[in-house]
Amino acid sequence: MTLKDLPIGKTATVTTVGGEGALRQHFLDMGLIPKADVTMVKFAPMGDPVEVRIHGYELTLRLADAEKIEIDKIRDTITEPMRPQGARPIFHPGLGEGGKYHVQTGEPLPPGETLTFALAGNQNCGKTTLFNQLTGSNQHVGNFPGVTVDRKDGAIRGVENTLVTDLPGIYSMSPYSSEELVTRRFVLDEHPRGIINIVDATNIERNLYLTMQLMELDVPMVLALNMMDEVRQNGGSVRVNEMEEMLGIPVVPISAAKNEGIEELIDHAVHVAKYREAPGRQDFCDVNDHNGAVHRCLHGIMSLIEDHAYDAGIPVRFAASKLAEGDQLVLDRLNLDQNEKETLEHIITQMEKERGLDRAAAIADMRFSFIQKVCGATVVKPKESREHARSVAIDRILTGKYTAIPAFIGIMGLVFWLTFNVIGAFLSNLLDMGIGALTDIVDRGMTAANVNPVLHSLVIDGIFTGVGSVLSFLPVIVTLFFFLSMLEDSGYMARVAFVMDKLLRKIGLSGRSVVPMLIGFGCTVPGVMASRTLPSERDRKMTILLTPFMSCSAKLPIYSFFAAAFFPGKGALVMVILYFTGILVGILMALLMRGTMFKGEAVPFVMELPNYRMPGAKNVAQLLWEKAKDFLQRAFTVIFVATIIIWFLQTFDLRFNIVSDSKDSILAVIAGWIAPIFSPLGFGDWRISTALITGFMAKESVVSTLTVLFGSSTALATLLTPLSAASLLVFCLLYTPCVAAIASVKRELGGKWAAGVVIGQCVIAWLMAGLVYGMGSLFI
């Protein structure tokens, strides 16, 4: 029987894990190992993927992958609280554990030397929150796997000569995805002085798997038990001193969200790094397990490769365990000769025979066996946490078979309605009135002061009209980001990926691709960067190329501007139509890509589902401030400069004389060359062509340029009909993203792909806008 056939609510024991390569290794690293108990929680609304519970946390995988995992001993699920037995008093030895558990690897570092730390941990364990507490930085914090997609650096507040690097969240040191490679390369190649390993205390079993691999690196290390406040609230606890003794490293209970225990963590981290106190334990084998098969294997490999590991700069214990599980990248770096490779294979094959498991499963089993001993002796866990019980209740609706899709549509519809018709629209009108009043005051003041007419025109017709028109849409953008950050912080985004996986698979993507694309509704740049969390290069490229079709918030001023001018009272409907048009075109492009450039199937859907959490007010406020600040910076830099340039080109002719009619200006001459391209679309006016060009710098510039050139939406309404306005909206929706987004695509995929995005989306936008205008002309 396979895991695919396990009934909901039943528990079984894993017997074998099929498959091959990096995916199988990833399953083993996530805890799907022989003898592990696994519970079937539920099926996705469309029947695939499934959610299972293993080692105390929820994991999603597809039926095709579940079919590769064989099980037996099917039984009813019984959840028991974890209570350590035979406890004995263990006293805390002091700062840095007083060297009690450590091996000093060298002389203390000289004063003034920079202490570099790697901040490493599983995805969604509070790592970025801790980084912000340590450094005072304001990095993005979320409640779904894959928030950190690049390394970020910062100095520890109040401690000189320190540098902490926030690395992407990983489950193991196996190279399954690009973020795991980033973390692994940093630790192995850049040699940090210390490692701060953050662990989710509500799920220690899963998190300690990475801890054991980090300890094998022989780098001074501190373990931060995060979310201890939740553990205590649920009646659980961790016997910290006993855990320190068993692991051989300092263990510090903290709550990063509440800033508890951070100072003690800093003291321990600085101490072990400064005095070069490496972990006191790196051998996790049981010499009595299957006659010490794994133990003899690892020590035999260590003897064989010791000199090679030293030359390659890889800790010998880490290299031995990775070779034993079949890590090809480590094998390539060691440069073993043919005889040594044959000896290595003989050692591992002998271990497999004695152990009764293949090499990867044997090493994973060795690690989880040690973890179970540690947790059994040190962790007090309730039968079920309040957070988990609450998540199960909420998921009955948000991931239910008949309620998940309607709930998603309802939630997104509510977000758009509140943003564009209620909160955002109300605040935007207030700000617009304020900007208008300020413009009148400045206008009257400059007129009274008899300011030069050219300068007067620059300030009022250029800066105030252009920048002011964009600023009035700030509340709409902030409101949308508020709701998106609430959904992200709560953990709902991960559920959307779970619900949508089967649907996205039909167009060649994984459910995990939905997260970068949802982020793309806020801004394309972080959406493109978030694609790094995808383990498949094929999926990553497809997701990057499709994300620009998701309408970003910078286009909201364009939609609002035209909706107010041509479709009054129907703003929300216009927004919904445009957003769904972008999604539909993205789907069509995905199908085209799947059949041409990116043939093949999407990678397996393996993702952790975090518990729902109440979004932190500080995190939400921080994100809103960042987005507002970014918008204001763009308004007073790119848009400000673009507005002045447009005003100048519109005000003067080729001989730099002031023109009485803007159609005689420099701008009219330049844009006149391009305008005929858009005539078949219903907006072949040079002023609109100019606005579209400036939109490449920043989408908000489209509105500021039109306002400068036309003076008001009323003048624009005399030029365009509602049909041509609809055609223009579709073009703005689909044509090339802004220069910042193109730069991010270039950084991820290279210059050829970035150029392809610019040209391809302009062509698609032209065709779709022409289709709208042509079809509309037949019926209107």
Tell where the protein language model's regions lie, with residue ranges:
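Conserved G1/Walker A P-loop phosphate-binding module
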Residues: 90-172, 190
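Conserved C-terminal guanine-recognition region of P-loop GTPase G domains, centered on the G4
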Residues: 159, 184-251, 558
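Canonical P-loop GTPase G-domain recognition
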Residues: 231-286
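Extended helical scaffolds that flank P-loop GTPase cores
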Residues: 248, 275, 282-451, 658, ...
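Extended, low-charge hydrophobic alpha-helical regions
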Residues: 354, 361-362, 381, 422-463, ...
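Hydrophobic core segments of alpha-helical transmembrane domains in multi-pass membrane transport
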Residues: 407-418, 480-485, 563-565, 578-592, ...
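Juxtamembrane inter-helical linkers in multi-pass membrane proteins
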Residues: 433, 437-441, 494-524, 599-623, ...
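Transmembrane helix-loop junctions at the membrane interface of multipass transporters and ion channels
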Residues: 549, 553-576, 740-750, 771-780
